[in-house]
Amino acid sequence: MLLMKLSVAIICKNEEKLIQRAIVSVQAADEIVILDTGSTDRTESVVAALNLPQVKFIKDSYVWKDDFADARNAAMDCCTGDWCLLLDADDFMAADSIPEIRAAIAAMPSARTIDCKILHEKSPDFYFYPKLIRLNAGVRMVGACHEVTSVRDAGPHAGTMILGYSENHQNDTGRVLRIMGQMYAADPTNSRTLYYLGREHYYRKDDAKAIPLLEACVKCSTFLAERADAYLYLARIFWRNQRGCDARAACMNALIINANFREALLFMATLSFEHNAVRWREFAAHATNERVLFVRNPP
């Protein structure tokens, strides 16, 4: 069996506190490429102190453009492996992920992307996302924020990535909103942009901006999981604005799209009188969450 070379591509800026954890979690990879986008802290010296021969730290060659896909593509272009694992400096891989990944890329010779299971460090939420990309197969990252692969192959997942949240992200609370706003200005009909920008305004309780964005998303999106999630966000917005009928209608639309959407079933219980709520909770207990975009309330 031909042994596939595995690269890891990390983009970073001012991650002196967390980048060691990220690197150590993938040190079994053949190559670790770190593209620095302008650090002014000790990130480089922390990396150098690890003294790992497979690590390549690249600085002063990339100008940050408020575009995560562009930076990830630049990092991938510096990799020499057959496959590339995309990792952020504040994230890390669970134990045994690299052996799982090696087995997967050997077993799926025709795949162009492979999903990883994505967990959150401080919550039980999870989802699956293509973090493994075959290099030189025409796959690129697209989207300045909440970027995605240009293609996505179906198949089993491999490895578990745990998302952290660095102080840099916490201190730059407007970054996502700023970049998503630029994406919306460039293409106001992109359903993915509408979804994520609407969700961002939902988090900020700016409902007057969130509602039209999410309503536009459910009208134009062809991705059913995205539409169902957008409907659920609309239901939550309507409910906190004392629009009970609209909330129930939006939540029901989410369930019409996917009757296995456990979070929507539980929220329908919240929206119902107790004698009906009992039934919704029973339905939720048997829901599989199949084809759900994000599993935020796992059993």
Model-flagged regions — what are they?
Residues 69-76, 93-212:
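Catalytic-site signature of metal-activated, phosphate-bearing donor transferases
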Residues 84:
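Short aromatic/hydrophobic "clamp" motif used to bind/position activated sugar donors
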Residues 17-20, 41-50, 96:
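Acidic helix N-cap motif at the loop->helix transition within catalytic regions
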